[in-house]
Amino acid sequence: MKMILSLFAQFAATVFAAEFAAGFVHWLEDAYIRERTPLIGRFVGRPNTIHHHYPRHMTRNSWWQSSWDLVLFAALLVAGAWSVGLLTWHVWLFAILAANANEFHKWEHRTRKENGRLISFLQDIKLLQTSKHHALHHTDPKNSHYCTITNVLNPVLDTLRFWDGHEWLLAKTIGLHRQPDTSVRGCGPGPAWLAEFSPQMARTNNRLPSNGESLLSHPSA
């Protein structure tokens, strides 16, 4: 019995560690990276801006398009752990979850029909984060609920003001301030190039369902 409880605790801790790591990266991207950010702005800031204005847009991406960078990170993690003899099941689980963090995120923006019965069931019983929970991240001022795998960590981190505290610390110590998010009401307008990604344009090209089919389809949901 003790062994079973120990394994369960290790499994849960690994899941939450992976979710926290993915949430931490998500926070960094949302708070500080924009399309004009040197080197990574085009690859990280631009897609992030699109996502905050048009959350449903990410659902048209394939698994590889959504996850290639995380897969490379996970591969490096596994290779590093293997090279020093520390490649345990915990590392494998962490790597698999981290590599698929954007896929979990994508499920929260898809309809139940798009997700299918299994994913929808896991969301219904709260083993996976629900769309309703993630919708809080897309509610102005869009500065909370960065973790996207379960419903567990966000209430804890946000109650502790974990992200606010880190932003305050970075501003006070190195002068790094959170960047404005043009998808937040009153902080726009967004960049002109966003027009080509609007839901109206997407429907014209038969790329996305109508707004009524998703809780998070509105640009400022």
Segments (PLM) and residue ranges:
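Core segments of transmembrane alpha-helices
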Residues: W64-W82
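Short, flexible coil/linker segments at or flanking structured domains
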Residues: A13-V15, W89-W92, D124, H137, ...
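Cytosolic/stromal cytosol-facing helical appendages immediately following the last transmembrane segment
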Residues: K2-F8, F24-I40, H51-W64, L97-A221
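Extended non-transmembrane interhelical loops and adjacent amphipathic helices
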Residues: R42-P47
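Interfacial segments of alpha-helical transmembrane regions
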Residues: S6-T14, W82-A98
